[in-house]
From Swiss-Prot:
It comes from the Bacteria. This is Minor fimbrial subunit HifE. GO terms for cellular component: pilus. It holds the Pfam family Fimbrial. One of its GO terms (biological process) is cell adhesion involved in single-species biofilm formation. Belongs to the fimbrial protein family. Keywords: Fimbrium, Signal. Residues 1-30 form the signal peptide. It is found in: Fimbrium. Disulfide bonds: none annotated. Its main location: other.
Length: 437
């Protein structure tokens, strides 16, 4: 070989080597387990397809932190705990035990390229995908989530539990399977011979409170943890052709270790609430303009005045955590003080009777949109109280907007059940009860 041809040959090898290096560093395939095939035995052949090596799978929650709040003051539902994600949309509240999606730096799974068969017909390779929970870090307290999956107590954290689902994605579908507290099969993979199919693995989690908020002395911050939750591997499969001339083996000589980087979690004990300022109703008393008897007889209903109801929700002790506002939903119930039926369906406010008082008239309060009427209910902050409704404007974290309010209009209403329409003074009294949910 002359010098020139040697140099050309060397340069060609250099280019090939560089290309191979680039392919091997591709992050998409870095954690895909591939198969190696070997043939042994004669005259009865055994074709063995082996997945070698151990992999580590690191997953992290898509949200870096979750704030978990006890119920607002008047929320009697002790099960439906609410949470808010840092950097989530304004006032974003969702059940704490919704599924939390995760992310991984690389795709992880199994490739079946190289699993070949020259027999006719070929057997169907069935590889059970197994999950082994790491019970040194996860303690099953004997509870299940709403999907029937096991809830595990995190190591050294008695207040918090977690449940998992492993996602197995094929070319056509993504199936989620609950992780159990013992060795279990996630799914039996039907592996076709002579194909380039692969599966990728995914993980999602739910958090669960294992304690009642009333047992907490203070707010609790649970810092992020890198927790081993278990391992995944394939169970060995053996099969043969119809005449047993060739045996086939599929095996996994390693496993995939799963590590979950949990988000920061804040358990907010203080109950969310708002407060009334010195003048929650403005003006108070509400002064109505005078109307004439003939006008009301002609129209049956006439506007008499307006008032505004406002409550402040800017107390950071109750409504703020980790720099994020967590407001309750502010609702109100109006209750009549002068004999109106407070059953949540009646919308007429009875006026006072006596010397000099008008008769044949009641009052109706309409909400800010001018069409919905206030219906009177019992003096109670209980959730779902008859007549209870949500104030039109709810508190917002923007600027100094941490309050709830609504403007109401008061109407004179001709009411024959109150007697003949006679001019006089019109007085009525109603109270309101706030409910923070």
């Amino acid at each position: 070989m002359n010098k020139k041809s040697y140099i050309n040959h060397y340069l060609t090898l250099f280019k090939v080597t560089t290309l191979l290096f680039t392919l091997s560093s591709n992050p998409v395939w870095a954690n895909i387990k591939t198969v190696q095939g070997t043939t042994s035995g004669f005259p009865l052949l055994t074709r063995t397809f082996t997945f070698n090596g151990n992999l580590q799978w690191n997953v992290s929650a898509l949200q870096p932190a979750y704030i978990v709040s006890s119920q607002a003051r008047d929320n009697l539902d002790t099960v439906h705990i609410q949470s808010s994600e840092i950097n989530a949309p304004t006032n974003s509240l969702a059940p704490f035990n919704n599924w939390i999606n995760t992310k991984s730096a690389v795709e992880l799974g199994y490739s079946f390229a190289g699993i070949t068969c020259t027999s006719n017909p070929c057997p169907t390779m069935k590889l059970p995908l197994l999950f082994h929970p790491d019970l040194t870090n996860l303690t099953p307290p004997g509870k299940k989530n709403s999907d029937g999956g096991e809830i595990f107590k995190l190591h050294n954290e008695s207040n918090l539990g977690v449940s998992f689902q492993i996602g197995v994605k094929t070319n056509t579908s993504l199936d989620w399977v609950n992780a159990k507290n013992n060795f279990s099969s996630l799914k039996v993979l039907m592996v076709p011979f002579n194909s380039s199919d692969k599966i990728s693995l995914h993980l999602r989690a739910k958090f669960h409170l294992l304690t009642d908020f009333s047992s907490l002395n203070n707010d609790i911050t649970i810092d992020p943890m890198n927790t081993s939750i278990g391992k995944i591997n394939l169970e060995t499969w053996r099969g043969s052709t119809g005449n047993f001339s060739v045996k086939y083996v599929g095996e996994d000589k390693g496993d995939i270790s799963i590590f979950f980087n949990t988000p920061k979690i804040i358990l907010k004990k203080q109950q969310r609430r708002c407060t009334l300022n010195n003048a929650p109703v403005s003006p108070n008393p509400v002064k109505l303009r005078a109307v004439k008897k003939r006008e009301l007889e002609a129209q049956s209903e006439m506007e008499g005045g307006t008032f505004q109801l406002r409550v402040n929700c800017d107390n950071t002790t109750y409504n703020k955590a980790n720099g994020k506002w967590l407001f309750p939903v502010v609702k109100v119930t109006f209750t009549d003080e002068d004999g109106t039926t407070n059953n949540g369906t009646n919308d007429l406010l009875r006026t006072q009777t006596g010397s000099g008082q008008a008769t044949g008239v009641s009052l109706r309060i309409k909400r800010e949109n001018g069409t919905e009427t206030v219906k009177y209910g019992a003096d109670s902050a209980q959730m779902g109280n008859a007549g209870q409704f949500e104030l039109r404007k709810q508190p917002s974290p923007a600027g100094g907007d941490q309050y709830a309010e609504e403007t109401f209009k008061v109407y004179y209403v001709k009411d024959s059940t109150r007697g003949t329409l006679i001019e006089g003074k019109v007085k009525a009294a109603a109270t309101f009860t706030m409910s923070y949910q």
